[in-house]
Design a protein with these regions (language model features):
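Charge-dense, helix-prone N-terminal extensions
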Residues: 1-169
Length: 169
């Protein structure tokens, strides 16, 4: 799967808005070119888009997130929140234990599901250059993350219940 295909897959989910950061968004310049998927069935805009349920990152963030080596041609990373329970089923240990288990993972491996190099302790997972080896799992995790985002949205009473001014970035 290439980046455009992954974004099309995400956009096909009901109630989803995908924002690609750029000069016309509130995103910091370092995030320009990266895409963020939000469950926003009312298309209420930035106020409703606090936390993405999926991100597609196209470059390393120097000094913060470089372990995936995203500077390689055509390489990007899909990030998804699996949650503690699913993360534990996937990797055999809870997200809180990732600090002690980091050496077990090649965060720059292509087409392999790994804990997110920065947000793994919060239950996020990632795949650098998803392809045939991870496609089924990516689709399942994407559906899982989308459903969790939908449930969170419903619990909060939809976009109207969330009137804070802070941006989702």
């Amino acid at each position: 799967m290439d980046e455009a295909e992954v974004i099309r897959l995400i956009r096909a989910l009901p109630g989803v808005v995908v924002v690609t950061a750029g000069p016309d968004t509130a995103a910091p310049e370092v995030a320009w070119g990266d895409s963020f998927a939000f469950y926003d069935p009312d298309d209420a805009g930035e106020a409703a888009r606090r936390f993405p349920f999926a991100t597609v990152v196209t470059k390393d963030y120097p000094g913060f997130d470089t372990e995936s080596r995203l500077g390689r041609p055509g390489v990007f990373r899909l990030n998804l929140p699996a949650g503690r329970e699913r993360f534990t089923r996937l990797f055999g240990f809870p997200p809180a234990d990732l600090g002690d288990r980091r050496a077990e993972f090649a965060f720059d491996a292509l087409d392999r599901l790994v804990p997110h190099p920065v947000y793994g302790r919060q239950g996020w997972v990632s795949v650098v250059a998803p392809g045939p080896a991870t496609e089924r799992e990516v689709r399942e995790l994407l559906a899982h993350a989308h459903e969790r985002a939908r449930q969170r949205y419903e619990r909060r009473g939809g976009a109207a219940a969330d009137d804070r001014d802070d941006a989702s970035w």
